[in-house]
């Protein structure tokens, strides 16, 4: 029993952060306070009006505090602790991929491309975009409007003739001397930059001026080119939703909450245009106040620096924040410029907020339907297998090409569906090519021949294969020498029918020693197909990546003495990989940095392939 009176006697009145632990020593809640003593004392009053707080207090075994120099410092430390410990009584934003941006590189002939992750490449970044599809769509549009290269530098540096993009008018061909001058190319780059900045009218004004100049100089072909470009840009502008009011870059956050599930909709506005939106479904403890949810989400969302998010000038929310000022100060510090949080907006901002609220509600309805369907499928599978509960399932699959570059995948489902943070791939080696049984054995040993926490022990393990694969899996488990309960998982083989069609699978249930054929409309079968397909796609994705690596290294980089620089020199001077393969020994020797001995090694290696 936690002795609150004795603990509180030694707590300071200074600002800081507190961490609450349960009897297992796990952090169950992280909070901050202007006055640690006052805040912590409030948890141990006789009458607590919050069910969430009552539940939290009943699990407290110990509390640790950290004094900070200011409330702002406490706020930042709180979010760092929440991210590190993932406490169950805090609102948790599930870790998310970084946002994609459009990158305009800083080179003699800049290229325009998508970028995700840390901004190490020199150039200008535009975004963020809500997902990769929005970036691809924008890049495709830019390619039609402005003939700027989108190719990788490895392709650009080794061209001896213009590519197909030049032939169809989507690139001006800066890789080949004489096709476009540096000035003309830079002009198109400047137009693309203005377009991405939302300055469409400036682009049109410049192009109209260019068209008129070309016409006055009787260069009608050039004038016609600019005319077509103007028409294409006008057609795009007409389709875009643009606010007439001058708006700063801003993100709009709206929350919808129902039946224990919260949806936070983030709408991205840049230069008055809607770039897109994204839905988030944070883990929310029961009876959480929506203002607290909004406050925590804003902090976690913008303070995860590794995500590469740019903090906009304005953040609009649909709930009043208790610590709005502290958040503004912290976000301003992080952004290096003034950041405003607004919760009472009018005009176009109000329209955008309403749009975000509608999207949040629509996404929540879809999520609730999906959650209900998953629960129904779990219930059906529990009844089929006579299990009281299923909390965690894992599924294995093997992928290879003619026995080469073998990859095994393991995907994990919990009661909410795919748990992608726990997905794993395993490189399989040291087996006979094409031996799927040995591959499965190696994957299972890598996964389970180690200590496991109780919550990580699966209730069901699906093996994608027939009796042979399942029997090999059972042998592996029989030989495991581990401290956790290896008899807990129910191993099930999922065998495809003779026609290998979905809906004709047979379940081979190990502990019940029976085979089950389910009807195509069975909810239990749909859940099994879902996890099996996830495992299959995960394995194929890993295999393709490994195969591509092997392919790129099978030529030059696999040769001892040929690194990235020498490989680039060979490709550049001999006109690509095919040129290297067709080159004579003397031609290879003439490449700068390639000695006679290395040239002979390259020549002999490529001839023997």
Swiss-Prot record:
GO MF annotation terms: DNA binding; excinuclease ABC activity
InterPro entries: GIY-YIG_endonuc, GIY-YIG_endonuc_sf, GIY-YIG_UvrC_Cho, Hlx-hairpin-Hlx_DNA-bd_motif, RuvA_2-like, UVR_dom, UVR_dom_sf, UvrABC_protein_C
Highest rank taxon of the organism: Bacteria
One cellular component (GO) term of this entry: excinuclease repair complex
Gene Ontology terms: biological process: nucleotide-excision repair; SOS response
Keywords associated with the record: Cytoplasm, DNA damage, DNA excision, DNA repair, Excision nuclease, SOS response
Keyword Transferase: no
Family label: Belongs to the UvrC family.
Subunit record text: Interacts with UvrB in an incision complex.
UVR domain sequence ranges: 201-236
Domain GIY-YIG: 13-91
Protein localization: Cytoplasm
Protein name: UvrABC system protein C
Function: The UvrABC repair system catalyzes the recognition and processing of DNA lesions. UvrC both incises the 5' and 3' sides of the lesion. The N-terminal half is responsible for the 3' incision and the C-terminal half is responsible for the 5' incision.
């Amino acid at each position: 029993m936690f002795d609150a009176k004795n603990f509180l006697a030694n707590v300071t009145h200074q600002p800081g952060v507190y961490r609450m632990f349960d009897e297992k020593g796990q952090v169950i809640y992280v909070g901050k306070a202007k006055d640690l003593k006052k805040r912590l004392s409030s948890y141990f009053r006789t009458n607590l009006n919050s069910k969430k707080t009552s539940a939290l207090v009943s699990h407290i075994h110990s509390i640790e505090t950290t004094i900070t120099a200011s409330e702002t410092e406490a706020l930042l430390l709180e979010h760092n602790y929440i991210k590190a410990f993932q406490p169950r009584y805090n609102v948790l934003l599930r870790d998310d991929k970084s946002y994609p941006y459009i990158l305009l590189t800083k080179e003699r002939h800049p290229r325009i491309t998508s970028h995700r992750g840390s901004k190490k490449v020199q150039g200008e970044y535009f975004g963020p975009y809500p997902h990769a599809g929005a970036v691809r769509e924008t890049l495709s549009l830019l390619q039609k409007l402005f003939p700027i290269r989108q190719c990788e530098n490895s392709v650009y540096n080794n061209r001896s003739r213009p590519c197909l993009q030049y032939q169809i008018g989507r690139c001006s061909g800066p890789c080949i001397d004489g096709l476009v001058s540096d000035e003309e190319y830079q002009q198109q780059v400047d137009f693309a930059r203005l377009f991405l900045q939302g300055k469409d009218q400036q682009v049109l004004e410049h192009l109209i001026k260019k068209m008129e100049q070309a016409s006055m100089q009787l260069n009608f072909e050039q004038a016609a080119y600019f005319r077509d470009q103007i028409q294409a840009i006008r057609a795009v502008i007409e389709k875009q939703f643009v606010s007439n009011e001058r708006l700063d870059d801003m993100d709009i956050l709206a929350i919808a909450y129902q039946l224990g599930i919260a949806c936070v909709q983030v709408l991205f506005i840049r230069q008055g245009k809607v770039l897109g939106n994204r839905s988030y479904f944070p883990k929310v403890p029961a009876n959480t106040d929506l203002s607290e949810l909004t406050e925590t989400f804003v902090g976690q969302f913008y303070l995860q620096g590794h995500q590469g998010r740019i903090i906009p000038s304005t953040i609009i929310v649909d709930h009043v924040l208790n610590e709005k000022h502290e958040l503004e100060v912290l976000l301003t510090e992080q952004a290096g410029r003034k950041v405003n949080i607004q919760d009472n907006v009018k005009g176009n901002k109000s329209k955008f907020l309403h749009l975000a609220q509608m999207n949040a509600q629509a996404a929540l309805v879809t999520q609730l339907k999906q959650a209900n369907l998953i629960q129904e499928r779990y219930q059906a599978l529990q009844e089929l297998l006579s299990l009281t509960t299923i909390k965690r399932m894992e599924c294995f699959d093997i992928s290879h090409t003619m026995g080469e570059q073998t990859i095994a995948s393991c995907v994990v489902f919990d009661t909410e569906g795919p748990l992608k943070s726990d997905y794993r791939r395993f490189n399989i080696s040291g087996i006979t090519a094409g031996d799927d049984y040995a591959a499965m054995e190696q994957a299972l040993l890598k996964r389970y021949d180690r200590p496991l926490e109780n919550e990580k022990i699966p209730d069901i393990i699906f093996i994608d294969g027939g009796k042979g694969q399942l029997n090999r899996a059972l042998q592996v488990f029989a030989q495991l020498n581990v401290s956790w309960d290896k008899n807990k998982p129910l191993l099930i083989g999922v065998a495809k029918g003779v026609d290998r069609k979905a809906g004709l699978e047979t379940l081979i249930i190990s502990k019940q020693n029976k085979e089950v054929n389910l009807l195509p409309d069975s909810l239990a079968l749909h859940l099994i197909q879902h996890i099996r397909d996830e495992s299959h796609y995960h394995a194929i994705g890993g295999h393709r990546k490994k195969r591509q690596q092997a392919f790129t290294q099978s030529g030059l980089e696999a040769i001892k003495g040929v690194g990235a620089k020498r490989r680039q020199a060979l490709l550049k001077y001999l006109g690509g990989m095919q040129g290297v393969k067709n080159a004579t020994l003397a031609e290879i020797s003439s490449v700068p940095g390639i000695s006679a001995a290395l040239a002979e090694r390259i020549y002999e290696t490529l001839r023997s392939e």
